[in-house]
From Swiss-Prot:
Protein name according to UniProt: Glutamine--tRNA ligase
Source organism phylogeny: Bacteria, Pseudomonadati, Pseudomonadota, Gammaproteobacteria, Pasteurellales
GO process terms (BP): glutaminyl-tRNA aminoacylation; glutamyl-tRNA aminoacylation
Binding partners and assembly: Monomer.
SUPFAM superfamilies per UniProt: Nucleotidylyl transferase, Ribosomal protein L25-like
Keyword tRNA-binding assigned: no
Subcellular location: Cytoplasm
Family the UniProt entry places it in: Belongs to the class-I aminoacyl-tRNA synthetase family.
A cellular-component GO term for this protein: cytosol
Length: 559
């Protein structure tokens, strides 16, 4: 397997392999000879785009295989053709590769094993361990019982092996309508575990499949498919989130009762990623997309990997986030600031600096006549990132928030009658203002001190404030998309009307200016716009004649 390229220069990411209970189990399995190698898998269902929660599973499964010199499969659990699509298959492949991982061989599909799965279902019937049930879905729910009341046996439970084989063949041949028959495992309707009360393992669906076309009209259920796929692929450690803990009983039961090569895989559960204020239900995310509440699955406000990527998150920052939160069996909610901290740390090291003015206010330096070309570092601490040339001209733009006619001593920016330093340039003084008919300031007239380029005033006066600027005659117009949380409540998944719960201020669009050095900003190219935040060129809408930058994260937490 290829080794992930680590961009985030964090000492933490270069520590020895992280310790968690799963790695302790693997260490023991290898030490005792239970397994001689490590084989994991990442098995998403292609019914939506991957989200931040999947990133944790990707980093865990591929990371373990990488660290133990093992292998990790990418397998699509494609057992429900109604909800799945090749679009999702392609996006998942892209996301895994973008995160820095390579899977073993070609991608696998559960549908690759449909013939074998059918054969194992027949084997269970022949052993008297599966039967065709014709209860309606409503009747089946009634017969199933509750957590405090045992279920009841279906009247079809004691059919003969021959009858079940014939009926299952009819199911395969399309002789039953959807919902009129299913194949159930014969386990225990009185089990305290609902998953063991004769679960459905095959159902009828007349739907074309993105891999197998119209070959099948019956499809295996996830719980039946997943464990057998693991065994076929010789997976040693099948890693799932905690909601599948009870399903492990069915996982083991299926494998123990079919003729499949030993040793059998074993399932281990870990806590899923619950990120504060973040929605990870694919069904609800799909609703946001379908109702046009967001700009597709890759909207920068979405918690999808493609959305985070478009917003400006890097593979290294997401890997580092997954490393920091760790792997445990305890469910908890991770603060969103923990994710922001990872991308902020990454971009602080790797993003070149540039100047942007998002809420422009015209400045005219009355005693400055001849334009000057100033050389500025692309990064204050990394000489190897080089320098850039920026034009200083008589007319500039500064941010509206950086000027006041009157202010207290805590305001360290430009005030009428006082001085401030232009970033990497001279000290200027606000002399007078021009206002429009409504009393709004439209221009600040200034003077500059020509002896202050790169040095303090010779007379010893103190000028503490520094503000960014761009030349009004040598800058580029740009659109700035300032993103914040899509939802303001800590648990949006609990909201019934998810559309109504959207934060109306989650996207604010501004029209401003950037220095010319970013004219050819490539898709997803990140910058620190000084004193503004970390931004990246939008991968869909930004182009040389219409620059669009997305706010990735603020410069400081809580800013």
């Amino acid at each position: 397997m290829a080794t992930a390229n680590i961009e985030l220069q964090s000492a933490a990411e270069h520590e020895a392999h992280p310790t968690n209970f799963i790695r302790q189990i693997i260490d023991e399995d290898l030490a005792t000879g239970k397994h001689h190698n490590v084989y994991t898998r990442f098995p998403p269902e292609p019914n939506g785009y991957l989200h931040i929660g999947h990133a944790k599973s990707i980093c865990l499964n591929f990371g373990i295989a990488q660290d133990y010199h093992g292998k990790c499969n990418l397998r699509f659990d494609d057992t429900n053709p109604v909800k799945e699509d090749v679009e999702y298959v392609d996006s998942i492949k892209q996301d895994v590769e973008w995160l820095g991982f390579n899977w073993e061989g070609e991608p696998r599909y559960a549908s690759d094993y449909f013939d074998q799965l059918y054969g194992y279902a027949v084997e269970l019937i022949e052993k008297g361990l599966a039967y065709v049930d014709e209860l309606s879905p409503e009747e089946m729910r009634e017969y199933r019982g509750t957590l405090t009341e045992a279920g009841k046996n279906s009247p079809y439970r004691e059919r003969s092996v021959a009858e079940n084989l014939a009926l299952f063949e009819k199911m395969r041949n399309g002789e039953f309508a959807e919902g009129k028959a299913c194949l159930r495992a014969k386990i225990d309707m009185a089990s305290p575990f609902m998953v063991m009360r004769d679960p459905v393992i095959y159902r009828v669906k007349f739907a074309s499949h993105h891999q197998t076309g119209d070959k099948w009209c019956i499809y295996p259920m996830y719980d039946f498919t997943h464990c057998i796929s693991d065994a076929i692929e010789r997976i040693t450690h099948s890693l799932c989130t905690l909601e599948f803990q009870d399903n492990r009983r069915l996982y083991d039961w299926v494998l123990e009762h079919i003729s499949i090569e030993r040793p059998l895989p074993h399932q281990y559960e870990f806590s899923r990623l619950n990120l504060e204020g973040t929605l990870t239900s694919k069904r609800k995310l799909l609703k946001l997309v379908e109702e046009g509440a967001v700009d597709g699955w890759d909207d920068p406000r979405m918690p999808t990997i493609s959305g985070l990527r478009r917003r400006g998150y890097t593979p290294a920052s997401l890997r580092e986030f997954c490393r920091r939160i760790g792997v445990t069996k305890q469910d908890n909610v991770v603060e969103f600031s923990a994710l922001e901290s990872c991308i902020r740390d990454d971009l602080n090291i790797n993003a070149p600096r540039a100047m942007a003015v998002i809420n422009p206010l015209k400045v005219i330096i009355e005693n400055f006549e001849t334009p000057e070309t100033l050389t500025m570092p692309n990064h204050p601490n990394r000489e190897e990132m080089g320098t850039r040339q920026v034009q200083l001209t008589k007319e500039l733009y500064i941010d509206q928030a950086d000027f006041r006619e009157e202010a207290n001593k805590q305001y360290k920016r430009l005030v009428l009658g006082k001085e401030v330093r232009l970033r990497n340039a001279y000290i200027i003084k606000a002399e007078r203002v021009e206002k429009d008919a409504e009393g709004n300031i439209v221009c600040v007239y200034c003077s500059y001190d020509p002896e202050t380029l790169g040095k303090n005033p010779s007379d010893g006066r103190k000028v503490k404030g520094v503000i960014q600027w761009v030349s009004a005659t040598d800058c580029l117009p740009a659109e700035f998309r300032q993103y914040s949380r899509l939802f303001t409540m800590p648990n949006p998944g609990s909201e019934e009307d998810i559309i109504a719960a959207i934060n109306p201020q989650s996207l604010v669009v501004r029209q401003g200016f950037v220095e010319r050095s970013v004219a050819n900003a490539l898709s997803e190219k990140a910058y620190q716009f000084e004193r503004e935040g970390y931004y990246c060129a939008d991968s869909k809408d930004s182009r040389p004649d219409h620059l669009v930058f997305n706010l990735t994260v603020s410069l400081k937490e809580g800013f």
